Design a protein with these regions (language model features):
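C-terminal segment of classical bacterial N-terminal signal peptides
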Residues: 16-26, 226
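Bacterial N-terminal signal peptides that target proteins for export
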Residues: 2-12, 210
Length: 231
């Protein structure tokens, strides 16, 4: 009888895992798409609702400083409908060196948008545009983007000649996820000797997958079944 109960509990776990993969998709790793989208798509077609904005400073040990503008919203239109959109902009206000990379960790994996898996995007705010006033117009675009499943890290790279230097800013860039926002610290890399990021900015990012907690609960339930049968 004990073996039968153990088999049933394992079957429940296996079924839950299968349903979880179906409902949420499987975690992904590798390059993100780094797709160029229009400002109109980002501000109108994707129909932003529940918009959240966070402007957070960063500082380096050599005195270089700036801000990260972070936006999260729930999309109700276009190809991203039903998903959360996360967008960032690097503003390098003062100091020497060249910003070469930006990453968010931990964050959940990027969603598939349309036929594009691991969807990420960048867009340039036109001069005079009034939407999302905390974002600056124009800027430097990332050359590539990626997601590391092991580290739960989304990253964007600004190599030569696309360095971000003093008084410059990046374009608006980000990714899309099925998961709601949380606030985490971001990392920034800069070329300038041994300068380190001493003041990390806070940004919005996709929160941890809730199904994992449910899976743990089912596992504990199964363990409880085993213990009760042994009494």
């Amino acid at each position: 009888m004990r073996r039968v109960l153990r088999f049933k509990a394992l079957a429940v776990l296996a079924t839950f895992v299968a349903l979880n993969c179906f409902a949420f998709g499987t975690a992904s790793a590798g390059p993100m798409s780094n797709t160029s989208v229009s400002w109109t798509a980002f501000t109108s077609t994707w129909a932003p609702t529940d918009v959240r904005v966070l402007v957070s400073p960063f500082t380096f040990s050599d005195g270089a400083a700036g801000n990260i503008v972070s936006v999260a919203y729930f999309s109700t239109g276009g190809a991203t409908a039903g998903k959360w959109v996360y967008a960032y902009q690097i503003v390098f206000t003062s100091g020497s060196g060249k910003i070469t990379a930006f990453s968010v960790v931990p964050t959940n994996y990027p969603a598939t948008v349309g036929a594009t898996p691991n969807f990420s995007f960048y867009t340039s705010k036109p001069s005079g545009a009034t939407e999302f006033p905390d974002f600056r117009s124009g800027g430097i675009a990332p050359i590539m983007a990626g997601y590391d499943e092991t580290l739960s890290e989304a990253s964007w790279v600004f190599p030569a000649p696309n360095y971000i230097q003093q008084t410059q800013n990046s374009v608006v860039f980000g990714y899309v996820s099925n998961f709601e926002p949380t606030i985490v610290q971001a990392d920034i890399s800069k070329i300038n000797g041994s300068a380190t990021l001493t003041g990390k900015p806070l940004v919005f990012a996709a929160s941890s997958e809730p199904a994992l907690a449910l899976l743990l609960g089912v596992g504990l339930l199964g363990a409880g079944m085993f213990r009760r049968r042994k009494k």
